[in-house]
């Protein structure tokens, strides 16, 4: 009998059809690219969040309160080696994140079904954290901040006054920048066109200092 080779190579060319919808790799995919139940970081805010999260090759993102998973998915689309752990308490939304990830080309995205901050225990150390939901959970932002690598980026969004208060306190303790977004889209008003305002969103973003890491290396004699 003829022995079969151990390795078989199969190449498949995927050619887009004439009505295929091209999706770029720049942050800010259309909202309808994601299956969602309304719990979605909208396109303009998502593009802003990703610019501040600043994905680089090989880096890991925690997407906390993932909703539809849009931020974590776009993080992974930035570079083939980028990784995401999406944390979502709702089982239907967690399953939806997995479907969106598979459909948008990042099936290796990891979904953790659980409630933060408890679900964060034991996760690998992140280079960046996005908190899109659950920001009022006691101790959540502090745990995310402490988990970050030096130089890591943390971005959190608030749509309620209660969560705004948490972000204001976080800025007072950890520094960073607070921005309020008001986005309006043109919409029909009878036979005319007017501006339809979306709900205002407050964004807190901060970068964890490198100073502490440098000081620790001096104390332990690990400088080069």
State each model region's role.
Residues 1-38:
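A contiguous loop/helix-start segment that scaffolds small-molecule binding in enzyme catalytic cores
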Residues 8-14, 188-224:
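Core SAM-dependent methyltransferase catalytic element
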Residues 40-57:
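Conserved alpha-helix/loop element of class I SAM-dependent methyltransferases that forms part
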Residues 58-67:
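Conserved class I S-adenosyl-L-methionine
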Residues 68-80:
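Conserved SAM-binding loop of SAM-dependent methyltransferases across substrates and taxa
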Residues 81-85:
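Short beta-strand element of Class I
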Residues 87-128:
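S-adenosyl-L-methionine
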Residues 141-202:
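C-terminal substrate-binding/active-site "lid" region of AdoMet-derived donor-dependent transferases
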């Amino acid at each position: 009998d003829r022995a079969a080779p151990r390795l078989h190579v199969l190449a498949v060319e995927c050619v887009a059809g004439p009505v295929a919808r091209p999706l770029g790799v720049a942050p800010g995919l259309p909202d309808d690219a994601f299956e969602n139940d309304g719990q979605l970081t909208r396109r303009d805010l998502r593009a802003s969040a990703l610019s501040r999260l600043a994905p680089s090759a090989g880096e890991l993102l925690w997407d906390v309160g993932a909703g539809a998973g849009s931020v974590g998915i776009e993080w992974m689309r930035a570079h083939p080696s980028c990784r995401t752990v999406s944390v979502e308490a709702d089982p239907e939304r967690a399953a939806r994140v997995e479907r969106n990830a598979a459909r948008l080309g990042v099936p290796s995205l990891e979904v953790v079904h659980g409630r933060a901050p408890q679900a964060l225990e034991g996760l690998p150390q992140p280079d960046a954290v996005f908190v899109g939901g659950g920001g009022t959970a006691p101790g959540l932002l502090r745990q995310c901040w402490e988990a970050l690598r030096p130089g890591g980026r943390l971005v959190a969004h608030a749509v309620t006054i209660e969560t705004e208060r948490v972000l204001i306190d976080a800025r007072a303790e950890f520094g960073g920048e607070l921005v309020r977004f008001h986005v309006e889209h043109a919409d029909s008003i009878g036979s005319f066109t007017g501006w339809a305002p979306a709900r205002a969103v407050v964004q807190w973003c901060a970068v964890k200092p490198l100073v502490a890491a440098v000081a620790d290396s001096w104390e332990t004699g690990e400088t080069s």
